[in-house]
């Protein structure tokens, strides 16, 4: 019995050591790899459709739309659409006041994944013209160079991209400070390490970019609570690599504490 316990502990230690080495390998590669700067191409021709899934987001949506309106990219090449999914507030009114197209959904299965799948089908039926789809949550602020960074990576053949997700309020509470640290570690060390190794990243729900060909071929086929990871696995099974783009940045407002964060993550 003692021998079996000893063997079990040894195997656990070996497994933990392997996992630790794997993570340290990611970190070393991420730190040592050179970050390529944006190409700063003068001629922009890529048409972007920015899709904002929203469920009772009247409070945060105005700031999101305001940040998107200031992005440095030709305005005639950007179309913004908000999915007002089963909202009991003024999300739809706020979306239209902010200059966005509003797609109102009042029935059907719940969940962010179902809302996005429905919206993509509606926009396709309407004949909305776009070369790439960007998904941004309704409580996020967009970096000025978000679309330029996505466009430069698209030009290099990266058809699916995950941008750098950080917080807009990293120093507000001890909880947000912890989340900010984990965000940096996840972005720079984990995703950055995978990128340096030539491996695929994982989608994170916001700050995502899909080429039109990927949208046409795969649509949105993930409907679980973790729809971003589910869709990531679906893409990987179809040999589609997810490129981590650290220059394409969005900033989400994090909840002040764990209880609020739990409600926020399950708000759909």
Predicted feature locations:
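Cell-envelope/extracellular polymer assembly enzymes that use nucleotide-activated donors
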Residues: 46-49, 79, 230
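Active-site beta-to-alpha loop of glycosyltransferases that engages the nucleotide-sugar donor
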Residues: 52-66, 86
